[in-house]
Structures are given as structure tokens and as C-alpha cells.
Amino acid sequence: MAIITLYTDDIAAKYESLKDSIQTSFDNKFSEAEWYCPMTYEGLREFIAESEDPDVAEWMVNTNQELYDAVEIEGIIDVVGSTYFYDGVELIPVDLFPDYLEEVMPAWGYHIPDFLVVDWKVVADVVADDYKMVTYQGQDYYFSA
């Protein structure tokens, strides 16, 4: 059974796309406004957080899912660390962690004799102490800290 894991560099590509989409949407909507000036994505995030302009509030409502997705990914970046995030950290679904360990332990050089019966849930509970957890799209994932 192949365990499906995520890699943060794939999420990073989605994040960059979201940032571009949010910024383009904002620029297209407000480029004619008297207060408008070009800004970085980070500057845009700060601006919309502090803005009291009703048009900006309406734009935020219409762009809610993209903003939510970007903020969720920023939370992962905060936990993983930006350097590691962009390098591609493997995210393992928590509910599949015992199966993941059973699959990868031999590849890591651990030979388990056939006559032993391993309770992989117990192994996962012990090994989980060496991992950190993040949540992405409602799913909890472990990653190696």
C-alpha cells in the first residue's frame, strides 16, 4: 500500500499562485482609486488588515476563499520554517502514520524479523514524539522536525 503524502514545495507553488491571484485581483479592482499605490503582497496584506474602506471590505468578502487559503499556508510556513517549507518537507497524514512507518522502516534500514508481530500503532505513538504536526485543508499531518 502506497501512503500518499504531501510535500511542502507543492503547497509552496499553490501559495505563490494564490499570492499572485490575490494581488492581481486587488490591482485590477483598485488601480483607479485615488489612494491606490502598487505594493508587495506583504504590504497588501497589511493594508487590507488595517483598511476601513467599504470597497476593500467588499473585495475581501469576494476574495475570502483565496485569502483564507493563503493564510492557512502561511500558518504552515510559520510552523515548518520558510527555508524548509520551500525545500519540500514531507507531510504524512496522522491517520496513516502507522502504515507509513510500516512501509518506510525497511527502507530506513530497520530489519524486522518475520517471526515478530509489530503493533504499528504503538510504534507510531512512540515515534510521533519526534515529529511536529500541522493542519492543512482540515487534515492533520506529521513532519520531521
Spans of features found by a protein language model:
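Acidic interaction surfaces
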Residues: 1-145
